[in-house]
Structure formats: C-alpha cells, structure tokens
Amino acid sequence: MPTSSTAADAPIAPAVPPGRTGRVARPLGVVRRWFDTGATVAETVDGDRIDWLRAVPFVAMHLACLAVLWVGVSPAALVVAAVLYAVRMFALTAFYHRYFSHRTFRTSRAVQFFFALVGASCVQRGPLWWAAHHRNHHRHTDTPLDPQSPAVHGFLWSHVGWFLTPRGFRTHWERIPDLAKYPELRWLDRFDLVVPVALAAALFGLGALLERVAPQLGTSAGQMLVWGFFISTTVLFHATVTIN
C-alpha cells in the first residue's frame, strides 16, 4: 500500500470544526452523542479505550441482522440488498476513497454532495471523518500512529476497534482543510446518523407499500428493513474495512 498522501504533514492533535471552540462539552445525553458528533468534540481522556455508549448503534446494527430469522427472505428483498450494496460500495470506493481522501479527480459541488449523501448512508461516518482518518492512515502506514495497521495493533483492533474509541471518533480537521470549507459536508460529518436513519425508514416504508400493493412479491416492511439496510450495510462495512 503506498504511503504518500495529499494531506499536510502536520502532527495529529485534537482539532475542532471551523467556527467552533475547543471547549470540552459536558455530558449531553447518550442520544445526542449518537446523533451529534460535535457534542463532545474535544474529548481526549483515555482516548484509546472503547466508548461503549457510542458503540451501541454499531453493535445494534449487527444484532439486527439476526431478525432475518423472523422476517424471512424474498427475491425482492435480495435484489434491494444487492443494489444498495453495489451503489453504496461505488460511493465509498469512488468518492469517499478516491475523491475525498486522495483527490484523484475533480467534479462539481452538486455531484460531490450527492455522493457524500450516498456514502453517508453506509454508516461509516461522514466524508470528512473518513477522509481525515484515511489520509492519516497513509501518512503513518504500519507505524504506532496508524491505528488501522494489523501489523502494529492486531487484526481485531484494526478491523473494528480503533474507530470505537474517543481518539478514533474525532475528525482531524487539520488533515482536510480542502474539504472543511464546505458547510454541507461539515453538516453531514456532524450529524452522520441522519442519512442512515432516513434510508432505514424509507426501506421500511417501501416494504410496507409493496406488501400492500404487490403481495405476490412476498416481502414486508420488516424484511425490506433487515435485508435492504441491516444486512446490506453490515456486509458493506466488513468488505470496506477488510480492504481499507
């Protein structure tokens, strides 16, 4: 894997979004911490421990896949799951990775935002967080400063552990000055669960509609939610972190 990067060679330090202070926020409730990543933006104490409160949505997404035992499967649900996997994998590969992280091509601001939205539905945080950490990964590949290195930290930590910590949760704004100037991207980064929740709700609604108007498809609201969102997203996550 190449170790060059377009990011500035500045040391990683606690950073805050443009226009915000570095004051440590008081606890604001678990729900706000899930939906507003800026609620404790300057958290630094014990930065390498797993924050289990913030990890709840990630764990719940995996457990929700077990609901397939109750909702069953249908060709319609499988098609939706496969299509959403492919479309979102493209958004991650072409835009989160090649465009936002490495800036390998140019596009319009509208296209940039559209694929940032699609990428945000993958439940892999916002495009700014993703790009900042990926740039840091390339800058410090296989060194103690690279939490994604299985050679240094072990497979399990590099696969699912590092981003569940306070240190991994922060967006390192000093790595992405070229992206942080866009307020719409900063909003997506701060409220990174809004798009996934909207997609899950839309899939539930689609399943309910199909169950009513096209019962011959054999699908339902719960089935479309489980296959189209939970299973598709979980498989997408593990495919992504296996590569990146």
Per-segment meaning from a language model:
Residues 1-244:
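Non-catalytic, topology-defining segments of multipass membrane proteins
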